[in-house]
From Swiss-Prot:
Name of the protein described by the UniProt record: Kappa-bungarotoxin
Subunit record text: Homodimer and heterodimer; non-covalently linked.
Organism classification: Eukaryota, Metazoa, Chordata, Craniata, Vertebrata
Any one Gene Ontology molecular-function term assigned to this protein's record: acetylcholine receptor inhibitor activity
Gene3D superfamilies: CD59 (2.10.60.10)
Length: 87
């Protein structure tokens, strides 16, 4: 009986996903994607280049381990730690 119980516990541990994985949007029109291990922060970055006045800001979204540093050509930068928060 103890062997059966121990076997069930081991199988349960092996089959379960023990680590929680974050999901973030990778592009404005994408469905949420699972982030790689260690990248638990979702981000949304809007930055301008020389064509910003014509086509608008360039949007970049995804998963990161640390929030990117804000730069002068960014219109906005959002870092968040809940699923799909970077929309």
């Amino acid at each position: 009986m103890k062997t059966l119980l121990l076997t069930l516990v081991v199988v349960t541990i092996v089959c379960l996903d023990l680590g929680y994985t974050r999901t973030c949007l990778i592009s404005p029109s994408s469905t949420p994607q699972t982030c790689p291990n260690g990248q638990d922060i979702c981000f949304l970055k809007a930055q301008c280049d020389k064509f910003c006045s014509i086509r608008g800001p360039v949007i970049e979204q995804g998963c990161v381990a640390t929030c990117p540093q804000f730069r002068s050509n960014y219109r906005s930068l959002l870092c968040c730690t809940t699923d799909n928060c970077n929309h």
